């Protein structure tokens, strides 16, 4: 981005730049501001005019939104249009985040493939799938409340919850379902219906994971708190030698963190040590209400109606099945043999382009029909490049994306089957679980 964000914004913007200069630390302490390129903008004033919803802008209060805007809008920052929200420049001592020109060229190719006038949002046929999932979830849960829980139906309900997570809340919370932000916002609460939390999900995925994929410090999904060794900067523990054996049952047990421990993160208004922007505080009360509502609806009410061990086991079966399905497909997408990691001791520097950081830390698996079942998230590369593009288009654009990526000289990994992806993940976990230096006969780090 040019040194002055005022070049297209007029004299008033230039004068503002002369009197206002912000370091990243200063912006971090001002949740009403956000950084794009080398300029600082009034996020609080802009959020209510944001077509995609005020909550997206609010979550980036006090943060750098350069790459977030780029990947969610698939175009360059409209400096002239945004000049009325300009409040100053990024301090000369700071290095601005640059837009990725190769990525913007890829966006132009992909946009040309989309149905005219669609904007990349959900096609009409998608809503039949969404309706079927909602009807299935409500019917099964209602039936078991009235007639009693069964283990088989509880497991199937867990799968339906997972499919709702993959096919409804995921696109909604990326703003990819509809051009009407209120629809995305409301359906985003499907995450709360299945036991998660929309605000924490947005912080984890939109604010952190998507911008810092497999970063050894900044990606929350690379933090296993000693349970697993996922990245080269993690310390080694003896049990890591067995992590390829316990990773799969551990994915089912993740349900209990999601169900209970995440509430502590919500109350602290943070995720993995990263504060949620105070500008998004209006989301707090609905988030707490939804968490309490889920506990009442899915845990307390069934146990009140049928206070038995069987009921408790069926509740666990649902949440563990859903947790396993979601965690399994997510984990194999970002943890496989040869996967990139970003930052110190990683295979990629943080100065690598946006495209390279997204592509070489992700992988695809399977094809069109797995995409129908899993909300397109088996096309994880395409999803990470275009998170606000509805999943129904991923299989269509994948060949063009792959050609473009390989021309750039970057690694594009697509596993033909889930089994081959799983095997690669287990191989990677085995390598990461080996005591550093042991494979060479050396001492542990």
From Swiss-Prot:
<keyword id="KW-0249">Electron transport</keyword>
<keyword id="KW-0349">Heme</keyword>
<dbReference type="GO" id="GO:0046872">
    <property type="term" value="F:metal ion binding"/>
</dbReference>
<dbReference type="InterPro" id="IPR012171">
    <property type="entry name" value="Fatty_acid_desaturase"/>
</dbReference>
<dbReference type="GO" id="GO:0016717">
    <property type="term" value="F:oxidoreductase activity, acting on paired donors, with oxidation of a pair of donors resulting in the reduction of molecular oxygen to two molecules of water"/>
</dbReference>
<feature type="transmembrane region" description="Helical">
    <location>
        <begin position="247"/>
        <end position="267"/>
    </location>
</feature>
<keyword id="KW-1133">Transmembrane helix</keyword>
<dbReference type="InterPro" id="IPR036400">
    <property type="entry name" value="Cyt_B5-like_heme/steroid_sf"/>
</dbReference>
<keyword id="KW-0560">Oxidoreductase</keyword>
<dbReference type="GO" id="GO:0042759">
    <property type="term" value="P:long-chain fatty acid biosynthetic process"/>
</dbReference>
<feature type="transmembrane region" description="Helical">
    <location>
        <begin position="148"/>
        <end position="168"/>
    </location>
</feature>
<feature type="domain" description="Cytochrome b5 heme-binding">
    <location>
        <begin position="11"/>
        <end position="91"/>
    </location>
</feature>
<protein>
    <recommendedName>
        <fullName>Acyl-lipid (7-3)-desaturase</fullName>
        <ecNumber>1.14.19.31</ecNumber>
    </recommendedName>
</protein>
<feature type="short sequence motif" description="Histidine box-2">
    <location>
        <begin position="205"/>
        <end position="210"/>
    </location>
</feature>
<keyword id="KW-0275">Fatty acid biosynthesis</keyword>
<keyword id="KW-0479">Metal-binding</keyword>
<comment type="function">
    <text>Fatty acid desaturase that introduces a cis double bond at the 4-position in 22-carbon polyunsaturated fatty acids that contain a Delta(7) double bond, resulting in the production of delta-4 desaturated fatty acid docosahexanoic acid (DHA). Mediates desaturation of 22:5n-3 and 22:4n-6 into 22:6n-3 and 22:5n-6 respectively.</text>
</comment>
<comment type="similarity">
    <text>Belongs to the fatty acid desaturase type 1 family.</text>
</comment>
<dbReference type="InterPro" id="IPR005804">
    <property type="entry name" value="FA_desaturase_dom"/>
</dbReference>
<keyword id="KW-0472">Membrane</keyword>
<keyword id="KW-0813">Transport</keyword>
<feature type="short sequence motif" description="Histidine box-3">
    <location>
        <begin position="380"/>
        <end position="384"/>
    </location>
</feature>
<keyword id="KW-0443">Lipid metabolism</keyword>
<feature type="transmembrane region" description="Helical">
    <location>
        <begin position="312"/>
        <end position="332"/>
    </location>
</feature>
<keyword id="KW-0276">Fatty acid metabolism</keyword>
<dbReference type="Pfam" id="PF00173">
    <property type="entry name" value="Cyt-b5"/>
</dbReference>
<dbReference type="Pfam" id="PF00487">
    <property type="entry name" value="FA_desaturase"/>
</dbReference>
<feature type="transmembrane region" description="Helical">
    <location>
        <begin position="283"/>
        <end position="303"/>
    </location>
</feature>
<feature type="short sequence motif" description="Histidine box-1">
    <location>
        <begin position="170"/>
        <end position="174"/>
    </location>
</feature>
<keyword id="KW-0408">Iron</keyword>
<keyword id="KW-0812">Transmembrane</keyword>
<feature type="binding site" description="axial binding residue">
    <location>
        <position position="50"/>
    </location>
    <ligand>
        <name>heme</name>
    </ligand>
</feature>
<keyword id="KW-0444">Lipid biosynthesis</keyword>
<feature type="transmembrane region" description="Helical">
    <location>
        <begin position="126"/>
        <end position="146"/>
    </location>
</feature>
<dbReference type="GO" id="GO:0006636">
    <property type="term" value="P:unsaturated fatty acid biosynthetic process"/>
</dbReference>
<dbReference type="InterPro" id="IPR001199">
    <property type="entry name" value="Cyt_B5-like_heme/steroid-bd"/>
</dbReference>
<dbReference type="GO" id="GO:0016020">
    <property type="term" value="C:membrane"/>
</dbReference>
<feature type="binding site" description="axial binding residue">
    <location>
        <position position="73"/>
    </location>
    <ligand>
        <name>heme</name>
    </ligand>
</feature>
């Amino acid at each position: 981005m040019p040194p002055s964000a005022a070049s297209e914004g007029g004299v008033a913007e230039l004068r503002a730049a002369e009197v206002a200069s912000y370091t990243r630390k200063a912006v971090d302490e001002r949740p009403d501001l956000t950084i794009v390129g080398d300029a600082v903008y009034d996020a609080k004033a802009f959020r209510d005019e944001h077509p995609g919803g005020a909550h997206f802008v609010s979550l980036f209060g006090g943060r750098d939104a350069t790459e977030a805007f780029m990947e969610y809008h698939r175009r360059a920052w409209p400096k002239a249009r945004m000049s009325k929200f300009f409040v100053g420049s990024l301090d000369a001592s700071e290095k601005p985040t640059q837009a990725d020109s190769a990525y913007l060229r890829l966006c132009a190719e992909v946009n040309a493939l989309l149905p005219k006038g669609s904007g990349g949002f959900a096609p009409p046929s998608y809503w039949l799938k969404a309706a079927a999932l909602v009807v299935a979830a409500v019917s099964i849960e209602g039936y078991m409340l009235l007639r009693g829980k069964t283990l088989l139906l509880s497991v199937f309900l867990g799968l339906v919850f997972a499919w709702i997570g993959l096919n409804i809340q995921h696109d909604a919370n990326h703003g990819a379902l509809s051009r009407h932000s209120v629809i995305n916002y409301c359906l985003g609460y499907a995450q709360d219906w299945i036991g998660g939390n929309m605000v924490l999900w947005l912080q984890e995925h939109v604010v952190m994971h998507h911008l810092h994929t497999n970063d050894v410090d900044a990606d929350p999904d690379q933090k296993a708190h000693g349970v697993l060794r996922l990245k080269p900067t993690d310390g080694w523990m003896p049990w890591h030698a067995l992590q390829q054996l316990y990773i799969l049952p551990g994915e089912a047990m993740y349900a209990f963190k999601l169900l209970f421990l995440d509430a502590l993160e919500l109350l602290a208004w943070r995720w993995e040590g990263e504060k949620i922007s105070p500008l998004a505080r209006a989301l707090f009360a609905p988030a707490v209400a939804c968490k309490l509502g889920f506990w009442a609806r899915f845990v307390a009410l069934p146990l009140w109606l049928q206070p038995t061990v069987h009921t408790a086991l069926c509740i666990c079966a649902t949440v563990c099945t859903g947790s396993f399905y979601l965690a399994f497909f997510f984990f194999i997408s970002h943890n496989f043999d040869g996967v990139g990691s970003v930052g110190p001791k990683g295979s990629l520097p943080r100065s690598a382009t946006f495209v390279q950081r997204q592509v070489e830390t992700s992988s695809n698996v399977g094809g069109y029909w797995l995409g129908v079942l899993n909300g397109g998230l088996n096309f994880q590369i395409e999803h990470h490049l275009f998170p606000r593009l509805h999943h129904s288009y991923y299989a269509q654009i994948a060949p063009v994306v792959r050609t473009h990526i390989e021309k750039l000289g970057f690694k594009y990994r697509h596993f033909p089957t889930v089994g081959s992806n799983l095997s690669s993940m287990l191989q990677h976990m085995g390598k990461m679980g080996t005591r550093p230096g042991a494979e060479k006969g050396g001492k542990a780090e």
